Amino acid sequence: MGVNVSTLEELINKWQDILRLRDWDIKLKIVETEWRKSGDIKIDMDDKKAVMLINNNPKSTNLEELVVHELLHLKLWGMDQMLEGFINQIFGEGEGDIKKEFAMNQFFILLESTVEDLTKGLLKANGCEKELSFGRLQKLIDSEIGC
């Protein structure tokens, strides 16, 4: 099947304006190999460059939702890195500390749920009528009922 690159580029351009990210250089890269994610974003804060990775066979059915989600990670990157650094200052850089693992897990859960809530709200406020993607939840349902 594959994703439509020009549609994705239009969505990135549209949402760069809405999210006030016009000062960033954002490149789109389609991931052709098997990949567990629908999307990701790699960020160079010093140079204000980012590469948005989109799975050519995404689990997400709403590409606009996927683009907004990844761009919000870019928008929140500074705060994300500050909080990760804070957790590392408290618990150290080493692995295996259950308190640090707990703090990091809670932080990432809160970050993802916040990004998801902001994504849904922004899509609705900007008139996106396409149904939200239930890809991750659908996978759980399929494994539960044997589809």
Predicted segment positions?
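Active-site recognition of the HExxH zinc-binding catalytic motif
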Residues: 65-77
